[in-house]
Amino acid sequence: MARFSDGSESYRSILYAEARKAARAQWWTGPEAITQYLDADAKGRLIQSLKSFLASRSLRSTEVLGRHYTIEELIAILLRDLRAEAERQFGVAVREARVGRPVRFVGADTEADDAYAVERLRQAFTLAGFERVEFEMEPVAAAGFYAARLQKDEVLLVGDFGGGTSDFSLLRVGPGGRELLGNDGVGLAGDTFDARLIRHVVSPELGLGSSIGSMGKRLPVPVWLYSNLERWHYLSFLRSKETLHLLKTLPGQSEEPEKLQALYDLVNEDLGYRLHQAVQRTKRELSQAESAEFRFSEGSVEIGATVRRADFEEWIADDLAAIAGCVDRLGTRQVDRVFLTGGTSFVPAVRRIFEERFGAERIESGSEFTSIAHGLALGG
């Protein structure tokens, strides 16, 4: 496995651009994008979770520092850096790739949407200089990692919980080979859980539920502002000239001006990434304790609250039901072992779905952030 500048074996799908000479953008990707963004004096453009846009036919491109880029072109920028780093570390030319893909992409309502997302991803690899690309369902790849240590065949249910999707595969694996018995998935996972925390803990302190207006006519603050705040791959959309102008006018029309001012400051000072870091810290702490202290103090924005795990589980109840539905559709009677991977598999309420159906003794996990990559390599 390659190891990157932050010491990890995973490469975050994040890009950061700043204007340089001749108005051309200079790009950083992965861990270096985060470092450059946090250290920059004049903020450029941070772009995250690009895979979440692949199934969307309405979002073909976006403007970055005066130039339009397609989603495929942006992903290709990241892939070129990743390929160059692999070539540097391993000393060989990299022209082929085995790539994990979710069972169901975020926003994909039909098989045609999924096929569209895969084709866009394939185009991105082509733009990045790859000559041959093979795709594998991510939970199937994780199954390959698990099966490498088996001495006898087992029926295995794999649950892969990423940022944007929860994916499941049922397979027969072991020395006798691998047989895929079924796939299912849903376009929600860790990012959705983060969004619930923002909606219930953060957004009320930024004016959600407040009203604005004058001359005796009051209207609620537009909810779409908070919907974009909740989804970290939409944060950059809040920084458009039109939206910033709207946000700047809201405190003067609001019954809670200090909260709307905090919302404007958060967006104008480009604090969204740090906000999501604070939310994710709280989510991780709730996996270890019955309550956690949410604290966000950046610039002029101060938010603090105690969050109870019981409340968090109530906020994500519908999401948990959707995940459980995937498991139940695949069937539970014949499963010998359950293998869980991905950061969201640490959430107690998620693990409880599997413990209630299979018993804790049949559940295993390990290499939660790299098992898919290991499985893809073993299958190559």
Where do the model's predicted regions map?
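Short beta-strand scaffold segments in enzyme catalytic cores
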Residues: 13-16, 167-171
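Short, glycine/acidic-enriched loop or turn micro-motifs at the edges of active sites
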Residues: 141, 163-164
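Phosphate-binding glycine-rich/basic clefts of nucleotide- and phosphate-handling proteins
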Residues: 173-298
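Alpha-helix capping/termination and helix-coil
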Residues: 205, 283-290, 323, 327, ...
